[in-house]
Amino acid sequence: MPSRDKSDVRCAVVGLDTSGSVGNDLMELFKGGLTRIFEDVGFDKIYIVDFTDQVQRVTEYDRGEEFNMSDRFWGGTHFGSVTDWIEEEGLNPSCLIYMTDGYGRAPMQPDYPVAWCLAPDTDEYTLKTSGIDQYGEVILLKEVA
């Protein structure tokens, strides 16, 4: 049987912001969002890219595999480190989903769909100064009671 090229695999990349500005409560919201992605969306693979101002760790999951929550790292936020990693790996993801507090600058728009999953209290100022409002779908995560 011929092997499949990475670009043929239906995959999603989740850029998980693990910078110092992301608190424990927001990490819990991210965890809930990741759980929904794993349960509801039929990707062959999901890559979780933990990033701050650089990629800290990449974990690859196959469909149905349970995921582990990330460690916390410290530092600033550079969204472009995730898109750079995607390009370096030669991936053509079905989508890129950022889970972030929005404190950083959005990279140039890539050739694949992008969603920005943000804290429920994210304000317009953060969206505009980061450039997140320029492309992609903005999703405010719901607080879990």
Where are these regions (language model features)?
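Extended acidic, low-complexity intrinsically disordered regions
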Residues: 5, 12, 16, 45, ...
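C-terminal region signature
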Residues: 136-138
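Short, structured coil segments at secondary-structure junctions
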Residues: 110-112, 134
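Acidic, polar low-complexity linker/tail segments
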Residues: 1-13, 22-25
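Redox- and metal-dependent alpha/beta enzyme cores, enriched for Fe-S-associated oxidoreductases
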Residues: 18-19, 25-67
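Extracytoplasmic/secreted cell-surface and envelope-processing proteins
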Residues: 23, 105-109
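Von Willebrand factor
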Residues: 47, 52-105, 118-128, 140-145
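Residues at the starts of beta-strands that form the adenosine-phosphate
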Residues: 11, 45-47, 95, 113
